[in-house]
Amino acid sequence: MFYHLLYPLHTAFAGFNVFRYITLRSIGAAVCAFLLVLFLGPLFIRTMQRLQIGQVVREDGPETHFKKKGVPTMGGLLILLSVTVSTLLWARLDNPLIWLVLLVTLFFGMIGAYDDYKKISKKTSEGLSAKGKLLLQIAGALIVGFFVYLHPGYDGQLSIPFMKNVQPDLGWFYIVFAVIVIVGASNAVNLTDGLDGLAAGPMVVSSAVYLLFAYLAGNVVLANYLHIPYVAGSGELAIFCGTLFGACLGFLWFNAHPAQMFMGDVGSLALGGALGSIAIIIKQEFLLAIVGGVFVMEALSVMLQVGYFRMSKGKRIFLMAPFHHHFEKKGWSEPKVVVRFWIVSIILGLFAIATLKLR
């Protein structure tokens, strides 16, 4: 909105010319989203407490989690509000990629909100059925998959880190691949959101890295120089990534141990869906496995645990899954698990950036 309202005035006052720069608007979007969450957070917490919308805790979970029962949840609504407002204020609204990512993010948020509502209303950790949730996620991911495959300028080619001349073309199967990436990312972030600040921290890192890659992918000179796919208009997604960065950082203010509120499925499913969608749109799909390594690790731990449990008829690989619970069972304190996972996330984020030159 600022671009459309203020940039045209640069002919009368040169200072308004700054609104054409993606870098400035990305910073503005991040700061705006951060401040929105920071200032609205206390009001949101009081409102959730008054409405008695609190966290439901698993009976078979670690005993240290029982004290989390009743802590305000669905903080993802606040994240989505700040992301939406900041995006509408700072992004170019004539860019279809902005609308695509924003609407898909909100759609995944709606899935999570309904899931949270069912959990809270039933006072149980079981919400929307796994099959129902998966079908809705697939429907949302298909929107991105079909858009990317059918939109002029896109194709079914993959961009593989470390290999500048290897770009396999999946053809129509790219749509299926896109669904796997987006749905997988959404569920991976959801599984990670089990400790105070555990999901928000890596999301800050991931959104910062994808902000950089979105900016580079939207600049034809830099994209060609770095041997990454050029995607016309994707530079504006740096602004959306900025809103994710700011919103998650602001949320972390209240979600750090001991948490004053949780994001709920409305937050985790939406953030994961947003991350996966951005990865698909800017053609940096495999980079997500690196920068989102913490999310991947958490998801894999659940799949391995369930698979091995069934194959071995009752035996387990980990003391408890997802992976963060394994370390809790080993005696690590919650803050220690979270901070160490943050450290891993930062290292992976830096490594992801390094892939720009390791080709």
UniProtKB/Swiss-Prot annotation:
Q: Quote the subcellular location field of this record.
A: Cell inner membrane
What this protein catalyses is:
UDP-N-acetyl-alpha-D-muramoyl-L-alanyl-gamma-D-glutamyl-meso-2,6-diaminopimeloyl-D-alanyl-D-alanine + di-trans,octa-cis-undecaprenyl phosphate = di-trans,octa-cis-undecaprenyl diphospho-N-acetyl-alpha-D-muramoyl-L-alanyl-D-glutamyl-meso-2,6-diaminopimeloyl-D-alanyl-D-alanine + UMP
Going by the UniProt record, its keywords in alphabetical order are: Cell cycle, Cell division, Cell inner membrane, Cell membrane, Cell shape, Cell wall biogenesis/degradation, Magnesium, Membrane, Metal-binding, Peptidoglycan synthesis, Transferase, Transmembrane, Transmembrane helix
Coiled-coil regions, chain positions? none
GO molecular-function terms, A-Z: metal ion binding; phospho-N-acetylmuramoyl-pentapeptide-transferase activity; UDP-N-acetylmuramoyl-L-alanyl-D-glutamyl-meso-2,6-diaminopimelyl-D-alanyl-D-alanine:undecaprenyl-phosphate transferase activity
Associated pathway: Cell wall biogenesis; peptidoglycan biosynthesis
* Segments passing through the bilayer: 27-47, 71-91, 93-113, 134-154, 170-190, 203-223, 234-254, 262-282, 286-306, 336-356
Q: How does it sit in the membrane?
A: Multi-pass membrane protein
What is the uppermost EC class here? transferase
Q: Which GO terms describe its biological process?
A: cell division; cell wall organization; peptidoglycan biosynthetic process; regulation of cell shape
Any one cellular-component term (Gene Ontology): plasma membrane
Q: Might you give the EC number(s) for this enzyme?
A: 2.7.8.13
Asked if the record carries the keyword Cell inner membrane, the reply is: yes
In Pfam terms, one family for this protein is Glycos_transf_4
Please give the cofactor(s) recorded in the UniProt entry for this protein.
Mg(2+)
Metal-binding listed as a keyword = yes
> Which PANTHER family does the record cross-reference, listed alphabetically?
PHOSPHO-N-ACETYLMURAMOYL-PENTAPEPTIDE-TRANSFERASE, PHOSPHO-N-ACETYLMURAMOYL-PENTAPEPTIDE-TRANSFERASE HOMOLOG
Entry similarity comment:
Belongs to the glycosyltransferase 4 family. MraY subfamily.
| Protein task | Catalyzes the initial step of the lipid cycle reactions in the biosynthesis of the cell wall peptidoglycan: transfers peptidoglycan precursor phospho-MurNAc-pentapeptide from UDP-MurNAc-pentapeptide onto the lipid carrier undecaprenyl phosphate, yielding undecaprenyl-pyrophosphoryl-MurNAc-pentapeptide, known as lipid I.
How is this protein named in the record?
A: Phospho-N-acetylmuramoyl-pentapeptide-transferase
